[in-house]
Amino acid sequence: YFACTDGGAAKYGQIYRLRPGTGGAADQLDLFYESTDAAAYNYGDNLCVMPTGHLMVCEDQYTDIVDNHLRGITPAGKAYVFAKSRVQTEFAGACFSPDGSTFFVNLMWPTMTLAITGPWGRVRVG
């Protein structure tokens, strides 16, 4: 998966998925998610795959209001809010520990790293 931060007709962002070919078949690149609504997803850039198969995406929009989120995207392509920043900063560097129990994410300012523990199998999409 990779993000096109300001891609799509509405310029709110897209996520593409690369499916490597097997047995000599060609690789396949497809559009996995495209936002048409800034309230649902806006300027996602850093992303990682959660232990559940969902994506965790860090938003990086530049506005005068505090409005960056960590967005989850289900395997079916539904976006949801996981967290919202309460300070004017962006989330970055999202990744999970090797055992999948701890999610690490950075805040650009004030500079800090958060370590968030699961249980990740109980994340609800609402």
Locations of regions flagged by a protein language model:
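Sequence/structural signature of beta-propeller domains
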Residues: 1-126
